[in-house]
Regions:
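Acidic/His- and Gly-rich active-site-bordering loop/insert found
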Residues: 1-101, 124-129
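Short secondary-structure boundary segments
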Residues: 4-28, 109-112, 163, 167-180
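Fold-level recognition of mixed alpha/beta catalytic cores in primary-metabolism enzymes, strongest
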Residues: 100, 110-117, 123-188
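Loop-rich non-cytosolic ectodomains and luminal regions
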Residues: 106
């Protein structure tokens, strides 16, 4: 069984400044498929923006009477800026004084890893689960946010894929937890 900290560290080790590159998605696809998910890579471009890689990983049939619950995540990060300003390298995950440091440790690679590990554990412990769980992971939340979630939602509609509920485990907010609902928000 995967460990949240170890998966977070692996995700942090990918330099995935917006738009996130293929290597982190290849890794995610492998992890999802090893845990019984089917995956679909969704690349979108146009509308005056760059090409963005997105994936949808799905567990369970989509044509049952069960509900379809989704986790909405992103693995792109803002540029780290001047590397000399960092105490540790942004893409070399480091645990110091009980904290995990590295670009994306909070927004949102750590949250993505925690969601994945939790769902994998749920599936393992609930073999009779009658429903569908999916992850939509985009590579463009921290910048334009044009060829990520917006186009994935359009693709879902075009393919008659209905999601009954979704949660973005994004940990950022303006003043209090839950005060922001947006398609994209630049962090750091």
């Amino acid at each position: 069984m995967l460990d949240t900290i170890e998966l977070s560290k692996k995700l942090i080790s990918f330099d995935s400044v917006t738009p996130a590159k293929q290597d982190i998605f290849d890794f995610l696809i492998k992890v999802f498929e090893e845990n019984g998910f089917t995956t679909k890579q969704l690349n979108f471009d146009g509308d005056g923006s760059y090409e963005v890689i997105n994936i949808m990983a799905t567990y369970g049939p989509t044509n049952t009477n069960g509900k379809h619950f989704n986790f909405l995540c992103h693995v792109d990060v803002v540029p780290p800026g001047n590397l000399e300003d960092w105490d540790t390298h942004p893409f070399e995950p480091t645990i110091k004084d009980g904290y995990l440091y590295g670009r994306g440790s909070e927004d949102m690679k750590g949250c993505t890893a925690a969601s994945m590990v939790s769902v994998f554990k749920f599936i393992k412990e609930n073999k009779d689960f009658n429903g569908t769980i999916s992850f939509i992971i985009t590579g463009d939340e921290e910048a334009d946010s044009i060829n990520g979630v917006k186009k994935v939602v359009r693709w879902l509609k075009e393919n008659n894929i209905r999601i009954d509920g979704s949660i973005a485990t994004e940990s950022s907010s303006e003043k209090i937890i839950g005060d922001q609902i947006k398609v994209g928000r630049k962090g750091a």
